[in-house]
């Protein structure tokens, strides 16, 4: 028996369906025309010219001419499509349609969006020619309508004021771009990096480098991590949506990369680094009862080396006021001082367009601070490393619809450190495929401030609603983001001083290993006791009885009754050692029964994030794929422009995983390109 492919089967089925439509249309005509049926029985179409429109990357218009039995001519207006992709596919698409005489064509590889729109136009024209009504072009989806997806006119060579010929061009000098730049420079490659920020104000955002198995960590007593265990744990937390090859590349190389990065750091600066969530204390938990594992492996740079814009004064050495920019400057200066013959950095110069030769990327056009256009021809490839799109509201509305649907009328996107998305735009214009679920750093997750898994959490109705210690802050906030708004309150009894010491490493988690942080938290409880029954400015309450605590929190009679019943039920669960309600790890089951009692009231909201952390689908070597999942020659993505590293949401089995991945995969990409 002859075998047919699934594609061939679908073509046959489609043709059969079209025949059925034809028969139905003719039957309708016969019923209407009566005695004229015999003379028109052989006709498939009403001769004439028909027009249809559809949405590709922009508006597409088709004009098709029909005889009684065939499509005789097709005209396509693809002027709103990408020059080198959709527009370039025009002749091929027309030929395929003419050969097939219907819309069941393969389309053009790399121009899937345009091909699908052309097929829709063909269907509509055929429907009209058969006496039916054209299907109205649907309202443009957010993806189709967003103006950023439409590529600008190509900048002509006549406007280029200077040309560079290099091996590799890198767009963006954050952690990934700088790491890739340094590696290529050390390998002797002719490399040029574009950085939009001026030299005098350039900095790299963030203060944690998450990694495993560096000599730095091991020398401080941090245990070695099994790479296979690490990969499987990561993939579980990423819902299986990360690229396991990229994650394993990170696991195997992050330690050596951090040691390499620190090798060029000023010793005085290096002495001011520390390890987050280290050392462990007697209460530290690393693996939860559900199997999720959390690791120590975060290097922090704690130095009040930058000024607070509001006060003009140096910041204190407190969490959230730390920057790694001195570490980045030391690495950049090392390259500038030692590899000026083959490595060039252009500050205040922004990449604006990729240079294409058909579907191949051959370089990039940039614009300097004076408005001049520069052309960089890159023999071995262009690296997109300009970060995410958290600073571009239109792109967030377009690319994060699942998150936007979670918002209340009072919530919206806010990412103060977000980039403008320009490198992602350039990649899309070149035909790059973005991952389906683009991850962000907490846009779709609500977390408790100073995330503490030990206390009982109740909602504004006084009821417990989830496992308080299910996972790290990002994953643990999924349910609240999708099901709750309003006040969330943490409930403690007088054993709070040991409860706050039991935790596990996590982004935004309470740092139980830092004595200053612990003392500051203990002071908040003492302050609540001093002003009882009133609240402190931080939202802490204290009362001698649970009844009085409920009153202080403002619960009405029904809420108060629910709250007291909730505490009673929770205490029963704690004493049994098994949380039959929500499955909480028994090590975090702390009964609420020894007065005085405390509460910390917060009102979580959705929409704030530091950055977006998702982008293009790539090969295992970070080469960008097109819409048909085929590599685009000459185009690569790293850092927060590269997708499929975290799954649907940023996760942190080690805090600082974003920067750690940027450094590691940026360097690995540099190695790969150097070997080309």
Model-derived regions: residue spans:
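Glycine-rich FAD pyrophosphate-binding loop
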Residues: 186-205
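Glycine-rich loop(s) and the adjacent beta-strand/alpha-helix scaffold that form part
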Residues: 369-372, 376-445, 622, 653, ...
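Conserved redox-cofactor binding core of oxidoreductases
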Residues: 251-369, 393-394, 567, 574-600
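An anion/pyrophosphate-binding glycine-rich loop and adjacent beta-alpha core
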Residues: 424, 433-555
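Extreme N-terminal leader/targeting segments of oxidoreductases
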Residues: 38, 42, 131-167
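Active-site- and interface-proximal helix/loop "cap" or "latch" segments in soluble metabolic
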Residues: 41-139
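A glycine-rich dinucleotide-binding beta-alpha-beta segment and adjacent secondary-structure elements
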Residues: 353, 561-649
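N-terminal secretory signal peptides and thylakoid transit peptides that target proteins
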Residues: 1-20, 24
């Amino acid at each position: 028996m002859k075998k047919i492919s699934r594609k061939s089967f679908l073509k046959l089925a489609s043709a059969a369906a079209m025949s059925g439509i034809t028969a139905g249309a003719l039957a309708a005509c016969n019923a209407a025309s009566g005695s004229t049926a015999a003379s028109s029985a052989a006709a498939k179409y009403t001769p004439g010219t028909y027009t249809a429109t559809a949405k590709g990357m922009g508006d597409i218009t088709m004009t098709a001419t029909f005889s009684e039995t065939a499509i005789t001519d097709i005209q396509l207006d693809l002027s709103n499509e990408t020059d080198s992709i959709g527009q370039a596919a025009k002749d091929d698409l027309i030929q395929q349609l003419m050969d097939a005489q219907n819309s069941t064509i393969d389309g053009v590889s790399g121009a899937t969006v345009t091909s699908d729109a052309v097929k829709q136009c063909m269907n509509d024209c055929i429907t009209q020619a058969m006496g039916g009504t054209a299907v109205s072009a649907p309202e443009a989806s957010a993806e189709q309508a967003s103006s950023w997806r439409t590529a600008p006119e190509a900048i002509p060579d006549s406007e280029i004021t200077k040309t560079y010929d290099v091996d590799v061009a890198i767009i963006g000098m954050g952690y990934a771009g700088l790491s890739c730049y340094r590696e290529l420079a050390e390998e002797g490659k002719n490399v040029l990096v574009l950085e939009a920020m001026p030299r005098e104000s350039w900095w790299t955002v963030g203060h944690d480098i998450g990694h495993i198995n560096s000599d730095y960590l091991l020398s401080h007593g941090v245990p070695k991590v099994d790479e296979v265990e690490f990969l499987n744990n990561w993939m579980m937390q990423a819902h299986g949506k990360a690229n396991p090859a990229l994650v394993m590349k990170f696991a195997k190389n992050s330690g050596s990369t951090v040691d390499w990065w620190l090798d060029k750091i000023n010793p005085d600066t290096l002495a001011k680094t520390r390890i987050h969530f280290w050392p462990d204390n007697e209460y530290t938990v690393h693996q939860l009862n559900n199997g999720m594992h959390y690791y120590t492996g975060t290097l922090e740079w704690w130095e009040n080396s930058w000024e607070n814009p509001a006060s003009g004064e140096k910041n204190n050495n407190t969490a959230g006021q730390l920057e790694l920019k001195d570490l980045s400057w030391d690495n950049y200066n090392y390259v500038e001082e030692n590899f000026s013959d083959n490595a060039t950095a252009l500050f205040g110069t922004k990449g604006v367009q990729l240079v294409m030769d058909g579907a191949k990327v051959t370089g990039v056009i940039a614009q300097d601070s004076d408005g001049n256009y520069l052309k960089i021809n890159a023999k071995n490839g262009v690296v997109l490393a300009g970060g995410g799109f958290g600073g571009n509201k239109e792109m967030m509305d377009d690319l994060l619809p699942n998150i936007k649907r979670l918002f209340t009328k009072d919530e919206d996107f806010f990412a103060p450190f977000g980039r403008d998305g320009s490198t992602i735009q350039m990649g899309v214009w070149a035909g790059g495929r973005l991952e389906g679920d683009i991850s962000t750093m907490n846009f779709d997750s609500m977390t408790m401030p100073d995330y503490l898994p030990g206390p009982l959490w109740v909602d504004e109705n006084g009821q417990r609603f989830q496992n308080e210690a299910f996972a790290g802050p990002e994953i643990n906030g999924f349910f609240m983001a999708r099901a709750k708004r309003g006040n969330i309150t943490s409930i403690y009894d007088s054993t709070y001083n040991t409860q706050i010491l039991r935790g596990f490493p996590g982004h935004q988690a309470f740092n139980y290993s830092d004595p200053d942080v612990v003392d500051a938290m203990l002071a908040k409880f003492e302050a609540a006791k001093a002003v009882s029954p009133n609240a402190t400015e931080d939202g802490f309450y204290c009362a001698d009885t649970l009844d009085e605590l409920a009153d202080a929190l403002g619960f009405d009679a029904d809420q108060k009754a629910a709250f007291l019943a909730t505490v009673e039920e929770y205490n029963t669960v704690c004493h049994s050692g098994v949380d039959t309600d929500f499955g909480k790890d028994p090590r975090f089951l702390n009964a609420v029964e020894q007065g005085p009692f405390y509460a910390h009231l917060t009102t979580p909201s959705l929409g704030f994030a530091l950055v977006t952390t998702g982008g293009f689908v790539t090969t295992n070597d970070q080469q960008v794929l097109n819409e048909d999942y085929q590599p685009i020659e000459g185009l690569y993505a790293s850092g927060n422009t590269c997708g499929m590293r975290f799954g649907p949401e940023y996760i942190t089995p080690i805090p600082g995983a974003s920067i750690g991945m940027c450094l590691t995969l940026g360097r690995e990409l540099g190695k790969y390109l150097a070997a080309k």
